[in-house]
Amino acid sequence: MLRLLCIAAFITFAPAAHATSAKQMEINRKAVAEFYEFAVNKKDFEAAAKFLGPRYVQHNPNAADGPEGLKAYVAFLREKFPDAHSDVIRVFADGDYVVQHVHSVLTPGSRGNAIVNIYKLENGKIVEHWDVIQPVPEKSANENTMF
């Protein structure tokens, strides 16, 4: 009987858990999109910081951990690359992770970089960040674009 009750409970509540998960993934996707726009394109640390969780672990070896590390990066962009702009080409959300494929141009007219950002979120807030950055080459071994 207990086994039958467990199966019935699973059948009843599993769709609701999945719907919540899909809803949370959309919340996470939107949070990362707004965070990135404020931090990188608008260079507004205060607005971007609202999307950070109680901790912010930075896995890029060239960037410091925590909100202060992000604040320093945003200030660097604002000072050295005020015209920098990034276009988010695609976004994937999977559970508590959001992945962005980005074309970043620090200096207008340059080819820029292809970037993949990976964010981990908890309760809708960003708590970890990884990235991989590759310069867009002048020539390619194939006819495909990086984007």
Predicted regions and their residues:
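A solvent-exposed, acidic/Ser-Thr-rich amphipathic alpha-helical stretch
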Residues: 45-94
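Low-complexity, intrinsically disordered terminal/linker segments enriched in charged
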Residues: 131-147
